Amino acid sequence: MNIQALMQQAQAMQKQVEANVEKAKKELADKEVQAEAGNGLVKVTMTGRHVVKRLSIDPSLLEDEPDLIEDLIAAAINAAVTKADELSETTLAKATSGMGLPPGMQGLFG
């Protein structure tokens, strides 16, 4: 195989990876994860691209101290971010599987 053929093969592979990654990003924008804090007192729904779609606060919390509400909101959002990151990693790994990329390279496309 000559150099020009290798270059063409590499370019074709790059285009395929880019198309798969774009498709995966669109898929992540449509998928949602949910997380909660305080045994469900605060719930967050977020897309796989880290866009918060819903925030639910149990009415009983509104009578408590604001510091508790703030802490629970932060905890719920952080839990949702973790879940969204896991979803993103899985989705992008599927999008780039079979491309012969070394381990850890899928993270470059997030």
UniProtKB/Swiss-Prot annotation:
The answer, when asked if Transit peptide is one of the entry's keywords, is no
Major location category of this protein: cytoplasm
InterPro entries named in the record: YbaB-like_sf (IPR036894), YbaB/EbfC (IPR004401)
Instruction: State any single GO MF term.
Output: DNA binding
Q: Where in the cell is it found?
A: Cytoplasm, Nucleoid
User: What UniProt keywords are attached to this protein's entry?
Assistant: Cytoplasm, DNA-binding
Q: Does the keyword Cytoplasm apply?
A: yes
- Domain of life where this protein originates: Bacteria
One GO cellular component assignment for this chain's record is: cytosol
The task this protein performs is described as: Binds to DNA and alters its conformation. May be involved in regulation of gene expression, nucleoid organization and DNA protection.
**Record's subunit section:** Homodimer.
| Protein name stated in the entry | Nucleoid-associated protein PsycPRwf_1729
Organism, as annotated: Psychrobacter sp. (strain PRwf-1)
